[in-house]
């Protein structure tokens, strides 16, 4: 490995997200293009070390993708100065221990979300990283989706006027695992293993809200475990102890009201698996993973309520599709490149451990709201 090469420890490369989005779509793609381009125009190459518990699995994965370095010994990898960055894609329960070790070893740290199971631990990680002087970042992948980037442009252009409300629909039907294999791992449905849709999705909604609309000031949430029994990877039935749906109302800074339904027990009747409708005084938009359509004020139809006559107007035809006039790369890869440049030349990357901790805090507040039946205020952290 060259002295100028950035060494990255990847812990959790055999998992669903760690493998597909981070290892294959991001890091191997960055390595294949020769690294990242710095502001002076030079390329900084990366080298990858994958870590896991099963050496045979790691060996097979390394051979498949031409990765030279792999190990089951995290401590030894962290002690090696060739590896400057530690990335964590483990299950949430195992995350804090590894990150603390990496910080203590002086490594820069990038991690999947949520950063911890509790906001106390999440803010502790932020404090430890700051005290150690290491760069730190948390995956904020939804911000890099083509649809949300188009939405950001609309907001920055003033298209909406005053933004009034945000409505979000996320989810799809995850099969129960009996007659059809589930698309998500069984631990997602066990609270004792760190599962639940609130702890998974509310951190996402937090960074979407605070980066596009304004920070979350309060939340009212209702959760449900609609399907109480599922079938695991071993073919055995198990009790689902975690929420599989969450219905949230969020008060955002500036008086914006947001409402998001998150569910793994909903059948999709929309163009994409997530859609947000943003309504403002001067116009509205509906955006998804890729698509975005708008309806300006001066092209808004004037409906009238008449239950005696069948509706003949096609309201979906009143929207104008935003053209895709640039190539959007994989969002995980784009953020990886930003974090690497943050490490190499202190380029901006605001999505740090403190931002990640605010997401954990919102998830906790959502669970507290569900338990108490109250709206929960959030501190400005």
Describe each region flagged by the PLM.
Residues 1-65:
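N-terminal Rossmann-like dinucleotide-binding module
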Residues 7, 231-239, 247, 251-252, ...:
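C-terminal glycine/acidic-rich active-site capping loop/insertion
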Residues 39-40, 69-81:
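Short acidic low-complexity segments
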Residues 111, 136-138, 167, 260, ...:
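Hydrophobic residues in well-ordered beta-strands that form the structural core
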Residues 3, 161-165, 368-381:
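C-terminal capping/lid region of NAD(P)-dependent oxidoreductase domains
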Residues 84-85, 91-92, 96-143, 158:
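Beta-strand-loop-alpha-helix segment that lines the small-molecule cofactor/substrate pocket
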Residues 142-240, 373:
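Predominantly a Rossmann-like dinucleotide-binding segment in NAD(P)-dependent oxidoreductases
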